Amino acid sequence: MNKQLRQLKVREILCQHDVGNQHDLMRLLNSAGIRVAQATLSRDCNEIGVVRSRDSKGYRLVYSEKNPGWIIKGLVGVEVLSVKANETSIIIRTLPGRAHGVGSFLDELKSPMILGTIAGDDTVLVIPGSIKQISELVSYIKDNLSQNA
């Protein structure tokens, strides 16, 4: 099966089923006769904008055709606990296990103000393009993550 058809099936499954994680999604794809490696499924999910959302039942994977950037921004913002800076760098504290997603989100912004990010389990180190723009970059990060970061 080609990539476009596989990604179309992923969207269809996510719109019709409550899917808690990629393993569940892979199982549903297998039931539909689609065999896919976990790494391929992960790339597909990233490319089509699948995100983890928390609802009353816990976490689930969601896909929305309606402005996925806004949805991702809101979800990532919920995961951020604080944004603090010193003279040379910015530290973002997140919920446990969520730093990688926050760092990836910031990387996808492709801002020239951000030289790069390094993510651990619950901390993201943001390296600014210029230390002269630290306060401006902190505001930019807060605006792009959430209003209350």
Curated annotation (Swiss-Prot):
GO process annotations (BP): L-arginine biosynthetic process; protein complex oligomerization; regulation of arginine biosynthetic process
GO molecular function: arginine binding; DNA binding; DNA-binding transcription factor activity
Pathway given in the UniProt record: Amino-acid biosynthesis; L-arginine biosynthesis [regulation]
Superkingdom of origin: Bacteria
Keywords from the UniProt entry: Amino-acid biosynthesis, Arginine biosynthesis, Cytoplasm, DNA-binding, Repressor, Transcription, Transcription regulation
UniProt xrefs under InterPro entries: Arg_repress (IPR001669), Arg_repress_C (IPR020899), Arg_repress_C_sf (IPR036251), Arg_repress_DNA-bd (IPR020900), WH-like_DNA-bd_sf (IPR036388), WH_DNA-bd_sf (IPR036390)
Cellular compartment(s): Cytoplasm
Main location, first listed in the record: cytoplasm
GO annotation, cellular component aspect: cytoplasm
Function: Regulates arginine biosynthesis genes.
Family membership noted in the UniProt record: Belongs to the ArgR family.
Protein name: Arginine repressor
Taxonomic classification: Bacteria, Pseudomonadati, Chlorobiota, Chlorobiia, Chlorobiales
